[in-house]
Amino acid sequence: MEISIELRELQPFLNERGQLKNWPAKKKRKVLALWYLAGQLEMRKVYSEAEINTLLDEWTVFHDPATLRRELFNHFLLNLTADGRQYWRAEEIPLLEAFLTKYL
């Protein structure tokens, strides 16, 4: 699989298993990390808070699911019910270039 030039910037933050080793400090890399994590969520699957936390913990080494959930939601990559009990991936995730343009 060929990695886009933009996504290569995230490479130093990934371990050999593809997990995020730490949360990037720079905004562009944070946005790349969010886009990457959103891509790990299944389409049309509804997750409980515990399930989404477990999944985010599986894709990160630093284990901060609350921050990641909030950031994914704030960037319209994750939806949740009003009571915060159920989460699901946004129906359409924009192409990486469009996503970067929107948030940078």
Positions of predicted regions on the chain:
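Short, amphipathic alpha-helical interaction segments positioned at domain boundaries
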Residues: 95-104
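Short acidic, hydrophobic short linear motifs in intrinsically disordered regions
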Residues: 43-56
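Short amphipathic alpha-helical interaction segments
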Residues: 59-71
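Amphipathic alpha-helical segments within well-ordered protein domains
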Residues: 35-38, 53-57
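A short, conserved structural fragment
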Residues: 73-84
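Short helix-capping/hinge SLiMs at alpha-helix to coil transitions
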Residues: 41-45, 61-62
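Short alpha-helical segments that sit at the start of domains
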Residues: 7-43
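Minor-groove-contacting beta-hairpin "wing" of winged helix-turn-helix DNA-binding domains
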Residues: 85-90
